[in-house]
Amino acid sequence: HKGAAGIVYCRSRKRVEDVAAALQAEGIPALAYHAGMPSDQRDAIQDRFIAEDGLVMCATIAFGMGVDKPDIRFVCHHDLPGSIESYYQEIGRAGRDGDPAEALLLYGTDDIKLRRELIETSEKAPEQKRIEHQRLNQLLALVETPDCRRQALLAYFGERLGEPCGNCDRCLTPVERQDGSVAAQKFLSAMVRT
C-alpha cells in the first residue's frame, strides 16, 4: 500500500509512538495520535491526516470517531483489538470510497497471554472477568477461523452471508484441513495400553 492512506491501531501510547517512529525511519509518512497529546495537537494531526494523501496514522482507539476519509486503503491492528465490536468498527474505516481495501491483524501467543493476565489481575468483579475472557475467546475464534472471515464476522452479529465472500485471506488461500481422527485414535489406544 505504498503511498496509500492507512491506519495502524495500537493498544498503548508508547506503541503508537514506537510504530510511528519505525515507519518514519523507513521513509513512510506516519503520524502518531493518542489521548496523551494536547487536544489542539490531536486536532491538527487529525486535520492533516484528512487533508493530505498517503499518510499513515498510528493511533490508539482515541482516533477514528468522526473521521471521514473515504480513501483509507488499509487498517492494521498492531495488537489484538478490545472486542469484535471494536474490530468491526475500526476496520470499517477502510475503503469507504468503494475501492478495495484491506484489514490486517497482527498478534501472537504472547499477546493472548498478556491479555488474559491483564484480565485476571484487574480489580474487576469475577463476573466481569468471566465476560472479558468470553469476549477474548470470541475474538480469537474469529481471527483463527479456517472459514470465510466475512461470514464469521457477520454471523457474530446475527447476520448471514449465503456464500463465502471470495475476498478474505481464508477464501483466497483456504486453510488445508486434515482429518486427525486416526492419529487421535492411535494416541488414545497407546495411552490405554501404557
Describe the residue ranges of each PLM region.
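Helicase motor core with emphasis on the C-terminal RecA-like subdomain
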Residues: H1-K124, I131-Q134, L161, D169
